[in-house]
Amino acid sequence: MEGRKEMLMYLEGGQLGTLVGKRMAHLSDAVGSPMAESQDKLVPKSPRAGPIAPTDRAEESEVEVGQATGQQRSRSPQLRISSPHPPAHSDSLSTKGQHSSSDTESDFYEEIEVSCTPDCNSAASDYQQHSAGQCSEPMGGSPVNGSDSSKGGGGSHGSFSACAGDQMRRYRTAFTREQIARLEKEFYRENYVSRPRRCELAAALNLPETTIKVWFQNRRMKDKRQRLAMTWPHPADPAFYTYMMSHAAATGNLPYPFPSHLPLPYYSHMGISAGSTAAATPFSAPLRPLDTFRVLSHPYPRPDLLCAFRHPSIYASPAHGLGSGGSPCSCLACLSTSTNGLGQRAAASDFTCSSTSRSDSFLTFTPSILSKSSSVSLDQREEVPLTR
């Protein structure tokens, strides 16, 4: 009996060594270990091993089948290898192998149920984005699909940023002509609209109140840009200024008619009487204080020096076209028609000037004058420092 127990201990120790060695080396085959072969060679040397050999062989085959099944199911990297404790009997060893294989199988299926593939993540994120309009990053996967879950997380992060960009995107409102005309009329009446008035406009125009508010903000900025463009440092070419004003009035951007031959903002500094203003302009009442082009006042303290902007009824004289001492006039109107003769120049020009009221040291300093330097001598193009 002692010899039989000793032989069983040898067999169990060899089989446990084979199991641990093969689990550490991740071998797919359960047979072929040199230690198992040595233990098999030791079996026939025992005189009492003959009668019990079939039983031992059956137990060995059962254990080896359990080992092979356990190793095939334990390919997941989450399998934890613990140091085995040698049992007292081979039956307990076989039952332990079966329990470990069943535990590994259950863990493996649990991991499959928990983990998610990148296709799963992208499909879930797309579904959430289209159904609920919100994007959320999925939870991290199990260590089995660690790299895949990280890739899926990156894709979901990209879709999250794209979703945020779509939510922040603002679409431009297409206004109808009737809506724009009504808003322009209201803006002409008052630049800043109160909230009750905005609500009334929104109800009348079938627009959101926020859209009305944003439109008035943009319109005020546009008005500010137009003022700065016309007043810095001063209109370079009065003809261009007149053309722009006439074009704006013709296209409907100005809520009032504009006479093409009268740059009105410059006449407010020249002391024009009410009768002459009413006779020369179609306005029956002064412009409102916050008018779009009302602030186009000239920045210079002596606007009467700019002969190109003088009113014909005030400064017209028979000596037009001649400066002091008989020198030719250098105003814009005279220079623009210098090739047509003196008489035709006085009749065709929109702006007339009088050389007697113009200082001898001042000449109109505009790009249109400098571009026609061939018709003006050097002594007549003196530059005067501008007073700020």
From Swiss-Prot:
Portion annotated as DNA-binding: 168-227
GO biological process, one term: regulation of transcription by RNA polymerase II
Keyword Transcription regulation carried by entry: yes
A GO MF label: RNA polymerase II cis-regulatory region sequence-specific DNA binding
GO cellular component: nucleus
Gene: xhox3
Location in the cell: Nucleus
Family the entry assigns: Belongs to the even-skipped homeobox family.
Gene3D superfamilies reported in the protein's UniProt record: Homeodomain-like
Coiled-coil residue windows: none
Organism domain of life: Eukaryota
A UniProt-annotated Pfam family: Homeodomain
Name of the protein in question: Homeobox protein XHOX-3
Organism: Xenopus laevis
Role of this protein: May be required for posterior development and development of normal embryonic axial pattern.
